[in-house]
Amino acid sequence: MRASPLLSLSIFITFVSIFSLLTYLPSFFAQISRIERQLEEELDEFLNIEHEFRKEFDIYPKNYERRQKKHVYSYCECEYINTCPPGRIGITGPDGQPGKDGLPGMPGSPGIPGELPNILYQQVFGCRICPYGPKGKSGYKGIDGPPGIPGWPGEPGVRGMNGERGSTGLDGAPGEPGSPGLPGFAGLPGSIGITGIKGVMGEVGEPGAPGIPGEEGLSGPTGQPGSPGSIGAMGYEGAYGDRGEPGPPGPIGRRGGPGLDSHYCPCPSRKMFLSILREKTKKQL
């Protein structure tokens, strides 16, 4: 019971952190593009300054006559340690135009402890190390190299947000009918229903043909006296049939409850009308 709140809290914190990370990515990429733009501007400014300096440097005439012709030998005449006195100071050039203020640079990361190469510890005999000359022109574009080795597969990306709910698809074709289920258990017996309203008295039907007298039945036990029925409407006088032999009175059964079709009133049968007519004729006689 205690693990459920902690689990829900951890899931909520995870979702919040992922959402904050996704919202920070646009500003992060915007900051990177801004830094690249600043670096490009500073590099263009530096190239412009270099171009102007080279133009001003080319204005002054080159005095080749003052140079003494050096003797060219098959070996280098310079020494590793130069003890020659420095030359006189040249003419001071004109002041350059003040440059534009540069953009503030990003703070650099602390460097690692440096190590002096082993080459500098070695004693060099022969020519001294001269400074590098001016930067040469860019060379021609070389031939495209062969394709590199395929890199390692990258790490899986962050899972994207859930997309919007799609529209409801079309109804599929109806499936095949399933196999018939097992027969259900028998239901509990229903409660006794409410006695229905007495229906409208139907029309008197045509008198039926006299029936064949039945065999004399066994004498049944004396039944309990039934409740008197309601007096029905006077019917049309029918033809007198042959009087049959009186049979022994049968037992009166108890009244049964309504069946399954208790709300459906079937039409009265012809035998019911004949029994009502016979009772009325007996009472009149």
UniProtKB/Swiss-Prot annotation:
MF GO annotations: structural constituent of cuticle
Compositional bias (Low complexity): 207-231
Regions that span the bilayer: none
Ranges for region Triple-helical region: 87-116, 133-261
Keyword list, A-Z: Collagen, Cuticle, Disulfide bond, Repeat
ATP-binding listed as a keyword: no
A single GO cellular-component term on record: collagen trimer
Top-level taxon: Eukaryota
Subunit structure: Collagen polypeptide chains are complexed within the cuticle by disulfide bonds and other types of covalent cross-links.
Function of the molecule: Nematode cuticles are composed largely of collagen-like proteins. The cuticle functions both as an exoskeleton and as a barrier to protect the worm from its environment.
Name of the protein described by the UniProt record: Putative cuticle collagen 75
